Amino acid sequence: MDDRGFVRWLQGLEAQGHEIVIHGYFHERPRRDGEKVGEKFLTRFYTEDEGEFYDLDYDEAFRRITLARDEFAKAGITPRGFVAPAWLLGSAAERAAAAAEMEYTTRLTGVRDLRFGDNFHARTLTYSVRNGWRRTASLAWNGVLARHLAGALLARVSIHPPDLNHLEIWRQILRLTDRLVEDRMATTYRDWIAERRTRRGV
């Protein structure tokens, strides 16, 4: 990581208790000839060519994750989790993340303890803001989903930088987050996974 200002910012966040995770390496997946309709839907429509770890083989996934891990380590930062871009994580890449000593990963629908293989269902609130109809659909869907998650053990809200460019999205994020923390305590994935392990006696 060549941007020293960025590195210092991350170091400061970690020192304050924030958790730094590996979120891909390039954050993109080149398009390929002969892709099936389902592959095109997930990698081009659902995301904008962001499914970097969607179908990477084990060796390449391991190389990228360990490369990112080691770059963080040189900066004195210790990421414990791996979250694939767009949560598109193939089975080979998941095994690679575990082999690279990542403690957990997340998907759209939950959290997985990579050390012990436990899955925790926890659908995340997230937004698609690329155009008007996506923003409208996101606002409606997340309003309903937040009510459904009212009694869930773990509530997750995934915020991306472009979300802040749309006032109606940002207002809903703040409103729903305020509601969710009324009877919950904010935590990191690292600490939440550690608590789950303690409860099961490991």
Residue ranges and their predicted role:
Residues 34-58:
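Active-site gating loops and adjacent loop-to-helix segments of metal-dependent hydrolytic enzymes
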Residues 104, 159-202:
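C-terminal domain-boundary segment and adjacent tail
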Residues 1-21, 74, 170:
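Active-site beta->alpha N-cap acidic-glycine motif
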Residues 118-168:
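A conserved mid-domain beta-alpha-beta active-site/ligand-binding segment of alpha/beta enzyme cores
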Residues 53-125, 165, 170:
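Catalytic domains of cell-wall/extracellular-matrix polysaccharide-remodeling enzymes
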Residues 20-23, 79-82, 104-107, 155-158, ...:
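Hydrophobic faces of well-ordered beta-strands that scaffold small-molecule active sites
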Residues 18-38:
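Short, solvent-exposed beta-strand-terminating loops
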Residues 1-6, 28-30, 83-92, 130-138, ...:
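Acidic-and-aromatic substrate-binding clefts and catalytic sites of carbohydrate-active enzymes
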